[in-house]
């Protein structure tokens, strides 16, 4: 029987690479040999640290990967052995010490079992798309979906507060639509990355007055503001950056706990607000992969760390202990 290796996290945040048997495929399933799986530091560690509830521990996280189809059941349609695919979910069942492992999305694994007729988020990787870069497709797709939902137009002044991978994805999507882009962060690495990929204005919130900088660019305030930090205390400062009858987007994930902000600011500004969720499904994923392949979305620059699967537990431990302040994006090579 074939075996698989998967990155496992326990409730006390211990990380290990463990081995699991791969059962015989059903007629509608295919087996994918993982090439690369992308790390989502924001969402995955919100789950690992209990900010988001994705079910019980132990858990195999990861929700984006690229690999090659190595076997396909007789009823699989649209895929065959040798195809390269990108995907969001792994349905391989895992047992650990007699207990079921919560695979949540489970793509941090050397193989994936997928029923393409039932699974959301699997598609053929187009020719010319780099596998390593493409394994980080979800975060920019989340940003693209948010920009599409907010209706960003040519000439709009767009602010993103918090330039993690999702926030940067939103900024680049807005820029490709012809918007004037302003990125706000406190991380020197993120600020430099934003400059290198063409963000129009970069604001260091640790040393500059954010409101003054934004008003110098857009005296009446920004047309569209995306709050991407996911930190509730940052909502009020971000709301102040909007113009009258502008648009405000809750781009960050604020977790299970209730949040609050001062009502009279968005009320007085008569803001339109949006709460995007997920990656925009197939249309956004397709667009992101295509733009990566063409070079219009220079996403390889966002990947600062690439590790072998055997090094993944150490990487996750270091991230959990906040030992990698310059980490931008990370990929596991299987």
Which positions does each model-derived feature cover?
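C-terminal hydrophobic helical "lid"/dimerization subdomain
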Residues: 1-2, 236-239, 282-334
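Glycine-rich beta-strand-centered segment in the early N-terminal region that forms part
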Residues: 23-39, 49-91, 126
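Residue-level marker of beta-strand positions
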Residues: 36, 64, 83-84, 111, ...
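NAD(P)H dinucleotide-binding glycine-rich loop of Rossmann-like/cofactor-binding domains
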Residues: 88-161
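Short, glycine/polar-rich helix-capping loops at beta-to-alpha or helix-loop-helix junctions
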Residues: 108, 186-193, 257-263
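Mid-domain Rossmann-like dinucleotide-binding core that forms the NAD(H)/NADP(H) cofactor-binding site
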Residues: 130-208, 212-213
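Glycine-rich cofactor phosphate-binding loops and adjacent beta1-alpha1 units
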Residues: 150, 200-272, 325
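C-terminal substrate-binding/catalytic core of Rossmann-like NAD(P)-dependent dehydrogenases/reductases
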Residues: 211, 215, 219, 256-305, ...
């Amino acid at each position: 029987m074939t075996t698989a290796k998967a990155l496992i996290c326990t409730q006390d945040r211990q990380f290990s690479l463990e081995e699991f048997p791969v059962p015989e495929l059903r007629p509608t399933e295919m087996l994918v040999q993982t090439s690369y799986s992308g790390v989502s530091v924001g969402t995955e560690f919100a789950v690992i640290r209990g900010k988001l509830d994705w079910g019980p521990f132990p858990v195999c996280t990861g929700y984006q990967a690229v690999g090659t189809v190595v076997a396909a059941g007789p009823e699989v349609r649209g895929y065959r052995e040798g195809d390269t695919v990108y995907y969001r979910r792994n349905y391989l069942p895992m047992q650990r010490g007699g207990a079921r492992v919560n695979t949540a999305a489970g793509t941090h694994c050397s193989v994936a079992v997928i029923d393409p007729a039932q699974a959301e988020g699997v598609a053929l990787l187009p020719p010319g798309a780099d596998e390593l870069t493409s394994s980080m497709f979800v975060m920019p797709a989340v940003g693209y979906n948010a920009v599409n939902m907010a209706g960003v137009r040519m000439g709009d002044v767009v602010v993103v507060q918090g330039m993690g991978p999702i926030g940067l994805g939103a900024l680049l999507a807005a820029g490709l639509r012809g918007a004037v882009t302003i990125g706000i962060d406190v991380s020197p690495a993120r600020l430099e990355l934003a400059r290198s990929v063409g963000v129009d204005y970069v604001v260091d919130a640790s040393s500059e007055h954010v409101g003054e900088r934004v008003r110098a660019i857009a005296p009446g305030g920004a047309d569209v503001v995306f709050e991407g930090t996911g930190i509730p205390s940052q909502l009020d400062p971000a709301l102040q950056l909007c113009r009258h009858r502008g648009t405000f987007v809750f781009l960050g994930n604020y977790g299970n706990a209730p949040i609050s902000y001062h009502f009279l600011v968005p009320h007085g500004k008569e803001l339109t607000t949006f709460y995007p969720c997920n990656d925009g499904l197939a249309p956004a994923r397709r667009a992101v992969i295509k733009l990566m392949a063409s070079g219009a979305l220079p996403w390889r620059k966002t990947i600062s760390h690439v590790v072998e699967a055997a090094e993944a537990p150490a990487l996750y431990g270091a991230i959990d202990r906040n030992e990698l302040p310059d980490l931008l994006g990370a990929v596991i090579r299987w």
